Amino acid sequence: MAKVKICGLKDPDMVAFAAREGADWVGFVFAPSVRQVTLAAAETLLLSVGKATPVALMVDPSDAEAQAVAALGFPILQLHGQETPARAAELKSLTGCAIWKAIGVQTRDNLGQIGTFPDIDGLLLDAKPPEGATIAGGHGAAFDWSILKGWTAPKPWLLAGGLTPENVAEAIAATGAPGVDVSSGVERIRGLKDRELVRAFIRAAKASEQP
Protein backbone atom coordinates (compact mmCIF):
# COMPACT_ATOMS: atom_id res chain seq x y z
CA MET A 1 0.00 0.00 0.00
CA ALA A 2 1.54 3.28 -1.12
CA LYS A 3 1.05 6.67 0.46
CA VAL A 4 -0.64 9.36 -1.62
CA LYS A 5 -0.11 13.06 -2.19
CA ILE A 6 -2.74 15.05 -4.04
CA CYS A 7 -1.05 18.22 -5.29
CA GLY A 8 -2.27 21.47 -6.77
CA LEU A 9 -5.34 21.86 -4.58
CA LYS A 10 -7.00 25.25 -4.29
CA ASP A 11 -10.56 24.60 -3.13
CA PRO A 12 -11.30 24.00 0.58
CA ASP A 13 -14.01 21.44 -0.15
CA MET A 14 -11.66 19.45 -2.37
CA VAL A 15 -8.91 19.60 0.23
CA ALA A 16 -11.30 18.21 2.83
CA PHE A 17 -12.55 15.57 0.39
CA ALA A 18 -9.04 14.37 -0.47
CA ALA A 19 -8.17 14.13 3.21
CA ARG A 20 -11.34 12.19 4.02
CA GLU A 21 -10.67 9.79 1.16
CA GLY A 22 -7.28 8.95 2.64
CA ALA A 23 -4.71 11.27 1.08
CA ASP A 24 -1.61 11.31 3.26
CA TRP A 25 -0.43 14.68 1.96
CA VAL A 26 -2.19 17.59 0.30
CA GLY A 27 -0.09 19.95 -1.78
CA PHE A 28 -0.44 23.66 -2.45
CA VAL A 29 1.43 25.44 -5.25
CA PHE A 30 3.17 28.73 -4.50
CA ALA A 31 4.60 29.25 -7.98
CA PRO A 32 3.22 30.51 -11.31
CA SER A 33 0.68 27.91 -12.41
CA VAL A 34 -3.02 27.49 -13.05
CA ARG A 35 -2.97 25.82 -9.63
CA GLN A 36 -1.18 28.64 -7.79
CA VAL A 37 -2.55 29.83 -4.45
CA THR A 38 -1.86 33.01 -2.49
CA LEU A 39 -0.76 33.14 1.13
CA ALA A 40 -4.23 34.29 2.13
CA ALA A 41 -5.89 31.45 0.23
CA ALA A 42 -3.49 28.92 1.70
CA GLU A 43 -4.29 30.07 5.22
CA THR A 44 -7.94 29.21 4.56
CA LEU A 45 -7.11 25.93 2.81
CA LEU A 46 -5.07 24.76 5.78
CA LEU A 47 -8.23 24.73 7.88
CA SER A 48 -9.53 21.84 5.74
CA VAL A 49 -6.56 19.43 5.73
CA GLY A 50 -7.93 17.13 8.42
CA LYS A 51 -5.47 14.30 9.11
CA ALA A 52 -3.52 14.92 5.91
CA THR A 53 -0.15 16.68 6.08
CA PRO A 54 0.08 19.89 4.04
CA VAL A 55 3.01 20.41 1.66
CA ALA A 56 4.02 23.73 0.10
CA LEU A 57 5.41 23.50 -3.43
CA MET A 58 7.83 26.33 -4.19
CA VAL A 59 10.13 27.13 -7.11
CA ASP A 60 13.41 28.88 -6.27
CA PRO A 61 11.87 30.81 -3.37
CA SER A 62 13.54 33.80 -1.78
CA ASP A 63 14.21 33.77 1.95
CA ALA A 64 11.21 36.03 2.54
CA GLU A 65 8.89 33.88 0.41
CA ALA A 66 9.94 30.67 2.15
CA GLN A 67 9.60 32.23 5.60
CA ALA A 68 6.14 33.59 4.81
CA VAL A 69 4.92 30.16 3.72
CA ALA A 70 6.53 28.41 6.68
CA ALA A 71 4.90 30.91 9.03
CA LEU A 72 1.49 29.62 7.94
CA GLY A 73 2.33 26.30 9.55
CA PHE A 74 3.51 24.16 6.63
CA PRO A 75 5.75 21.37 7.96
CA ILE A 76 7.16 20.49 4.51
CA LEU A 77 8.54 22.59 1.66
CA GLN A 78 8.78 20.82 -1.70
CA LEU A 79 11.41 22.52 -3.85
CA HIS A 80 10.67 22.22 -7.54
CA GLY A 81 13.16 24.62 -9.11
CA GLN A 82 16.91 24.86 -9.65
CA GLU A 83 17.75 24.90 -5.95
CA THR A 84 21.29 23.72 -5.19
CA PRO A 85 22.16 21.39 -2.31
CA ALA A 86 23.49 24.40 -0.40
CA ARG A 87 20.29 26.35 -0.99
CA ALA A 88 18.14 23.43 0.13
CA ALA A 89 20.15 23.25 3.35
CA GLU A 90 19.79 27.02 3.83
CA LEU A 91 16.02 26.87 3.44
CA LYS A 92 15.79 23.98 5.88
CA SER A 93 17.74 25.94 8.49
CA LEU A 94 15.88 29.18 7.78
CA THR A 95 12.35 27.80 7.97
CA GLY A 96 12.65 24.79 10.25
CA CYS A 97 10.63 22.84 7.67
CA ALA A 98 11.39 19.42 6.30
CA ILE A 99 12.67 19.76 2.73
CA TRP A 100 11.64 17.60 -0.19
CA LYS A 101 13.50 18.08 -3.48
CA ALA A 102 11.95 17.30 -6.84
CA ILE A 103 14.36 15.66 -9.28
CA GLY A 104 13.56 15.65 -12.98
CA VAL A 105 14.19 12.21 -14.46
CA GLN A 106 14.80 11.46 -18.11
CA THR A 107 17.76 9.06 -17.93
CA ARG A 108 19.45 6.94 -15.29
CA ASP A 109 22.17 9.59 -15.03
CA ASN A 110 19.68 12.02 -13.51
CA LEU A 111 19.53 9.87 -10.39
CA GLY A 112 23.18 10.68 -9.73
CA GLN A 113 22.42 14.18 -8.52
CA ILE A 114 20.35 12.84 -5.63
CA GLY A 115 23.49 12.04 -3.66
CA THR A 116 24.51 15.69 -3.75
CA PHE A 117 21.55 16.62 -1.52
CA PRO A 118 22.55 15.17 1.88
CA ASP A 119 20.46 17.56 3.95
CA ILE A 120 17.04 17.03 2.38
CA ASP A 121 14.37 14.91 4.03
CA GLY A 122 12.65 13.44 0.99
CA LEU A 123 12.65 13.13 -2.78
CA LEU A 124 10.07 13.47 -5.49
CA LEU A 125 11.03 11.83 -8.77
CA ASP A 126 9.17 13.52 -11.61
CA ALA A 127 9.42 13.51 -15.38
CA LYS A 128 11.67 16.26 -16.68
CA PRO A 129 9.52 19.16 -17.92
CA PRO A 130 9.11 19.39 -21.71
CA GLU A 131 11.47 21.76 -23.47
CA GLY A 132 10.16 25.31 -23.23
CA ALA A 133 7.85 24.52 -20.31
CA THR A 134 7.14 27.51 -18.08
CA ILE A 135 6.01 25.55 -15.02
CA ALA A 136 7.93 22.93 -13.07
CA GLY A 137 5.33 20.16 -12.76
CA GLY A 138 1.79 19.07 -13.49
CA HIS A 139 2.49 18.31 -17.15
CA GLY A 140 0.90 14.87 -17.16
CA ALA A 141 4.02 13.24 -18.62
CA ALA A 142 5.62 10.09 -17.23
CA PHE A 143 9.23 9.00 -17.42
CA ASP A 144 10.46 5.49 -18.19
CA TRP A 145 9.91 3.66 -14.91
CA SER A 146 12.46 0.98 -15.86
CA ILE A 147 15.13 3.63 -15.15
CA LEU A 148 14.54 2.92 -11.46
CA LYS A 149 15.19 -0.83 -11.75
CA GLY A 150 17.80 -1.83 -9.19
CA TRP A 151 17.99 1.69 -7.76
CA THR A 152 18.10 2.07 -3.99
CA ALA A 153 16.69 5.32 -2.67
CA PRO A 154 18.86 7.11 -0.09
CA LYS A 155 15.85 9.03 1.22
CA PRO A 156 12.08 8.54 1.51
CA TRP A 157 10.63 9.23 -1.92
CA LEU A 158 7.52 9.71 -4.02
CA LEU A 159 6.94 8.90 -7.66
CA ALA A 160 5.32 11.58 -9.82
CA GLY A 161 4.73 12.35 -13.46
CA GLY A 162 1.87 11.17 -15.62
CA LEU A 163 0.16 9.14 -12.92
CA THR A 164 -3.58 8.45 -13.20
CA PRO A 165 -6.12 6.19 -11.50
CA GLU A 166 -5.61 3.78 -14.39
CA ASN A 167 -1.82 3.42 -14.19
CA VAL A 168 -0.86 4.15 -10.58
CA ALA A 169 -1.01 0.52 -9.46
CA GLU A 170 1.20 -0.50 -12.39
CA ALA A 171 3.62 2.32 -11.56
CA ILE A 172 3.91 1.22 -7.95
CA ALA A 173 4.42 -2.41 -8.95
CA ALA A 174 7.09 -1.42 -11.49
CA THR A 175 9.06 0.93 -9.25
CA GLY A 176 8.35 -0.08 -5.68
CA ALA A 177 7.45 3.52 -4.94
CA PRO A 178 6.46 3.94 -1.28
CA GLY A 179 4.47 7.03 -2.20
CA VAL A 180 2.89 8.63 -5.26
CA ASP A 181 2.11 12.23 -6.18
CA VAL A 182 -0.59 13.33 -8.60
CA SER A 183 -1.90 16.64 -9.89
CA SER A 184 -3.13 16.78 -13.49
CA GLY A 185 -3.93 13.05 -13.45
CA VAL A 186 -6.98 13.70 -11.28
CA GLU A 187 -8.33 16.61 -13.33
CA ARG A 188 -10.88 16.60 -16.15
CA ILE A 189 -10.58 20.38 -16.54
CA ARG A 190 -7.04 21.73 -16.25
CA GLY A 191 -6.44 23.07 -12.77
CA LEU A 192 -9.65 21.67 -11.26
CA LYS A 193 -9.57 18.42 -9.33
CA ASP A 194 -12.35 15.89 -9.98
CA ARG A 195 -13.81 14.05 -7.00
CA GLU A 196 -14.33 10.76 -8.82
CA LEU A 197 -10.76 10.76 -10.10
CA VAL A 198 -9.30 11.73 -6.73
CA ARG A 199 -11.21 8.92 -5.02
CA ALA A 200 -10.27 6.39 -7.71
CA PHE A 201 -6.59 7.37 -7.57
CA ILE A 202 -6.35 7.08 -3.81
CA ARG A 203 -8.15 3.73 -3.78
CA ALA A 204 -5.98 2.31 -6.56
CA ALA A 205 -2.78 3.42 -4.84
CA LYS A 206 -3.85 2.14 -1.45
CA ALA A 207 -4.87 -1.22 -2.92
CA SER A 208 -1.63 -1.64 -4.85
CA GLU A 209 1.09 -4.14 -4.05
CA GLN A 210 4.74 -3.16 -3.95
CA PRO A 211 7.31 -5.65 -5.26
From Swiss-Prot:
Lineage of the organism: Bacteria, Pseudomonadati, Pseudomonadota, Alphaproteobacteria, Hyphomonadales
Listed GO biological process terms: L-tryptophan biosynthetic process
Presence of the UniProt keyword Chloroplast in the record: no
Originating gene: trpF
Family: Belongs to the TrpF family.
Catalytic activity: N-(5-phospho-beta-D-ribosyl)anthranilate = 1-(2-carboxyphenylamino)-1-deoxy-D-ribulose 5-phosphate
Pathway: Amino-acid biosynthesis; L-tryptophan biosynthesis; L-tryptophan from chorismate: step 3/5
EC number(s) reported in the record: 5.3.1.24
Keywords: Amino-acid biosynthesis, Aromatic amino acid biosynthesis, Isomerase, Tryptophan biosynthesis
Protein name: N-(5'-phosphoribosyl)anthranilate isomerase
A GO term for molecular function: phosphoribosylanthranilate isomerase activity
InterPro entries: Aldolase_TIM (IPR013785), PRAI_dom (IPR001240), RibuloseP-bd_barrel (IPR011060), TrpF_fam (IPR044643)
